[in-house]
Amino acid sequence: MCIRDSLSNEDWWAQGYSEPGAGSDLASLKTTAVDKGDHYLVNGQKTWTTLGHHADKIFCLVKTDLNVKPQLGISFLLIDMDTPGVEVKPIITLDGEHEVNEVWFTNVKVPKKNIVGKENEGWTYAKYLLTFERTGIAGVPYSKSALNHLKMISKRSLKNGKPLIEDPIFSSEIAELEIDLLAMEIFNLRTVSAAAEGKAPGMESSLLKIKGTLVRQKTTELLRKALGPQALPYLPEQFDEGWNEMPVGPDYAGPIAKQYFNMRKISIYGGSNEIQKNIVAKASFGL
């Protein structure tokens, strides 16, 4: 039922992993699910829940055993967002947008059938899912599109009366960015090809996440540089239907500041880049 409705877009899912005291150290999460016979009673809080205010359901990591090593007492639970006791509160991010949320659970009754796999083995399932999430966070298609946008803006923006793209320092930064992106795309295709054969991405997803987020952040940084002061104003209303006022600067400058600030977070979510470096070091060198 869950898979069918997800594939048909009838259900929108949110992810309930991070908590105020459990981000990079996710295993220290405090949300509990107490066995009450035919259901679990869930209490706790999740944070940074992306688009949780639109979600129909949320898959959560919850503590089902407090007497064992943290990773061994975690279960993977599916919860309907309209269940009594579930409350969503907005978090306004640095770019002024409402994209993420806090989700509170107060005596939420969840049927026992909503557990995924076996009780207390949720940590294993979550780690597996995160390898695919990190591969996606690399965002190769996004970066390719943003790079083309950067080249267009660099041709239109002037420096000392000449197109910015003719500036040797700036053009070399674009070239370095494109080289990094091409190398990352090849590595990404290799990783996806292996996944199509049934192999989990593993350490490769961590490498992609590290490099991909740095490329995405660098792209928005160069876009901001290319536009100069015109990148500063952000007027979301100028994208509304029927808005006829004169934009501040060229129309393509509108979302640049928002994108720049929003991209600061991507090296943190999905497992911070510092954590990913630890994963790579452990897998490669046994550190």
What does each of the following model-derived ranges do?
Residues 22, 47-52, 94-95, 265-270:
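Glycine-rich phosphate/pyrophosphate-binding beta-alpha loops
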Residues 159-162, 182-245:
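C-terminal helix-coil-helix/basic helical segment that borders enzyme active sites and/or dimer interfaces
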